[in-house]
Amino acid sequence: MHGRYFPELMVTRAEKFIKQNRKHPFLLYVGFNIPHYPEQPLPEHAKLYEGMEEPRKLYASFITTTDYYVGRVMAQLEKYGLTEDTIVLFLSDNGHSVENYVIEKDNHSSGYPKGYDYGSNGGGGNTGKWIGNKGTFLEGGIRTPAILSWPGRVAKGETRGAVVSALDWLPTLCELAGVAQPDAKLDGHSILPIIDSSDAVSKHKALYFQWQEKWAVREADWKLIYMPDDGGKLSLHNLGDEKPEVHDYVSEKPEVVTRLKGLYDTWAADVFAPRP
């Protein structure tokens, strides 16, 4: 029995939604499962990169497939004359993946023995000078695209250098839609001033990251990262370095470590429920 390609199902439904709701304001969230592994591009896109070496070959093919489906959503907006006054956001949740998995038990359902290496579930990404990847708090793992299309208000090709977070989009969209924000405390800020002007600055005095026991806090160009391995380790980096996050300043800047650790402790006490 052949399965059905999930991106095709999702975009077909998105196209239908746009058609059905084209005559009044709408919010559409299209949560693509691509280019997340398993990397399964459309055959016609895989053929475009036959002369390229792996893992770049497979990743390039898959990115082209992603681009194709994003293009279909955009084409549907254009078809019904909605492009000019529709805000389109393209976001990602983490950097490129270099994960691989090994079977850790006997009698695995796949039939393969314990210790069998499935191989890489990704690869091929490139983050330039920013080292790191998915699963790390290095910039290569958390600095992700934020692409906005809004022809009626934002000119093509403009860029912004201010730091923003995915947390900022809810208050931003609430402001644009004239909707009252939730009564609950929000960590995000409206970035409408940044959208409108390249001179606007970020309202974030610090950014916080946490995954299980790992955490990081960033203030301006300083970033403190805690890894629980080997009894716990702190590393301090300056994002303004020529080679960011390569040099560790922990021993050189103890006062910065103390200040950033204090910021994290205050944030964690506010966010996390007390442990029993």
Regions found by a protein language model. Give the residues of each.
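The substrate-binding groove and active-site-proximal loops of carbohydrate-active enzymes
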Residues: 1-8, 51-65
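Active-site His/acidic residue clusters
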Residues: 12-59, 97-104
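Loop/turn elements at helix/coil->beta-strand transitions in domains of secreted/extracellular proteins
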Residues: 22-28, 82-88, 144, 202-204, ...
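Beta-strand elements within well-structured catalytic alpha/beta cores of enzymes
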Residues: 26-31, 63, 70, 77, ...
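Histidine-centered active-site microenvironments of extracellular/periplasmic hydrolases
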Residues: 38-41, 78-152
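C-terminal cap/loop subdomain of S1 sulfatases and analogous C-terminal strand-loop tails that border
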Residues: 108-139, 153-240, 255, 267-274
